[in-house]
Amino acid sequence: MRVALLMGGVSREREISLRSGERVKKALEKLGYEYTVFDVKEDFLKEVDQLKSFDVVFNVLHGTFGEDGTLQAILDFLGIRYTGSDAFSSMICFDKLATYRFLKDIVEIPDFIEIREFMETSPLGYPCVVKPRREGSSIGVFICESDEEFQHALKEDLPRYGSVIVQKYIPGREMTVSILETEKGFEVLPILELRPKRRFYDYVAKYTKGETEFILPAPLNPSEERLVKETALKAFVEAGCRGFGRVDGIFSNGRFYFLEINTVPGLTETSDLPASAKAGGIEFEELVEIILKSAFLKGEVRA
């Protein structure tokens, strides 16, 4: 099997993608797969036709282009098989506002509103969360407890993103649920609880060793564990996601509040999904092979 490994990309998550890609590359080598690495940059469309000579694309492009449905639509058009969710699901899940609107009657979501213009005060009160519609790795996310902090967040995000989501802040335990697809169906991995040393699970906390305490499995009683896993799987399936992914949320007062779905989650040495997989008895090389094989569960590919 010939594998095209796509890494790097043009988003603000490029460095994380390169780290994910390097780790996947070593795993593919150990597994004995024939592979070629593509460091995706601005001129990638000039070489995209080369992908037709491969059996499958292993996509570890995080953020815009690789995770927002753009790459997936191109590969669908060319009839090239790839890992992860399809173009529509990727597009929906990368846009948090679209995700919330799509899933609002299916799972519990903290109150939210879209803002396109500067405001003096939060329409949802404080504390609140300000975050971009389309971004990953907690880039551009602010927790605001005053008008001053709220205004600062808008001044940072609105010029860059054009619009932001303001969401009610739910105090509670941050949890992430990783999901794999195998020929037996969807497998929900052990729930990971995140206890960052910083104010919340931001970019630094995600990708710096020692900045976050990982609790695996999360200390939940059986009914709480069932609630979290069932909610995460319901969101994942209803959004049409495939292959592998991660669902993030807040567990508070016996309720699990959905926050987002990551359709191309990190695969670095500090990433959540590999940690959950290992807790479930799946070493990294096996995880890579499961993800790779899941690309062949999506039916016939037609150009």
Swiss-Prot record:
Which is a Gene Ontology cellular component entry for this protein? cytoplasm
Which Gene3D superfamilies does the record match to this protein?
3.40.50.20, ATP-grasp fold, A domain, ATP-grasp fold, B domain
Q: In which residues is ATP bound? A: 125-176
Name the keywords, alphabetized: ATP-binding, Cell shape, Cell wall biogenesis/degradation, Cytoplasm, Ligase, Magnesium, Manganese, Metal-binding, Nucleotide-binding, Peptidoglycan synthesis
Q: Which residues form the ATP-grasp domain?
A: 99-293
Which domain of life does this protein belong to?
A: Bacteria
Q: What class of enzyme is it?
A: ligase
Cofactor binding description = Binds 2 magnesium or manganese ions per subunit.
Binding of Mg(2+) 1 occurs at 248, 260
Localization, per the record, is: Cytoplasm
Query: What are its E.C. numbers?
Result: 6.3.2.4
Q: Which residues bind Mg(2+) 2?
A: 260, 262
- A Pfam match: Dala_Dala_lig_N
Q: Which cofactor does it need?
A: Mg(2+); Mn(2+)
Q: In which pathway does it act?
A: Cell wall biogenesis; peptidoglycan biosynthesis
Q: Name one GO molecular function term.
A: D-alanine-D-alanine ligase activity
Q: Does the keyword Cell wall biogenesis/degradation apply?
A: yes
**HAMAP family attached to this UniProt entry:** Dala_Dala_lig
So what does this one do? Cell wall formation.
Family of the protein in this entry: Belongs to the D-alanine--D-alanine ligase family.
Q: What is this protein called?
A: D-alanine--D-alanine ligase
